[in-house]
Amino acid sequence: MRKFCWAFTNCSEASLPNLRAPLKLDVRDSTWPVESVDYIFSANTAHIMSWPEVELMFAGVGRTLRTGGRFCLYGPFNRDGHFTSESNQAFDATLRARDPNMGLRDDRALKALGRQHGLLFMAEHAMPANNRVLVWAR
């Protein structure tokens, strides 16, 4: 299986003392580095994971997010089974050529996955470059 590593950026340079440093985790590990949290943010991950890994991420979020907490997922997503732009369609083709398990995820499938793990879809926010932030609550 692929292993992805993320290089922690210089969080200390942001001068946000009330914001904890990001945690490194592997969604395939059933033990996450925290037991419960109020907020989970993941950026540009769902399209580079296999679908089973996306399912594991949502299962982990469902186990870890406290009642009233929020899960925000940033990235390029298909809307209702369709690409939202030609550039997203081309990006999806590039990803799938590299690894057929990668690719843009459909928002309907992600919303259904959230429901399976006790998450209520709350909102979506358009972002630059045909990306969106999808927001769930526990």
Language model features with spans:
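Core SAM-dependent methyltransferase catalytic element
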Residues: 117-138
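Short alpha-helix
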Residues: 100-118
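A short beta-strand submotif of the Rossmann-like class I SAM-dependent methyltransferase core
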Residues: 39-46, 51-54
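A short glycine-rich, Lys/Arg-flanked "PGG" loop and its adjoining helix->strand segment in the class I
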Residues: 55-70
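Acceptor-substrate binding/catalytic loop of class I
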Residues: 86-87, 93-106, 126-127
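A short acidic, Gly/Pro-enriched loop at the edge of an enzyme's catalytic core
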Residues: 32-40
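Class I SAM-dependent methyltransferase SAM/SAH-binding core
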Residues: 1-31
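Conserved beta-strand signature within the Rossmann-like core of class I S-adenosyl-L-methionine
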Residues: 67-80
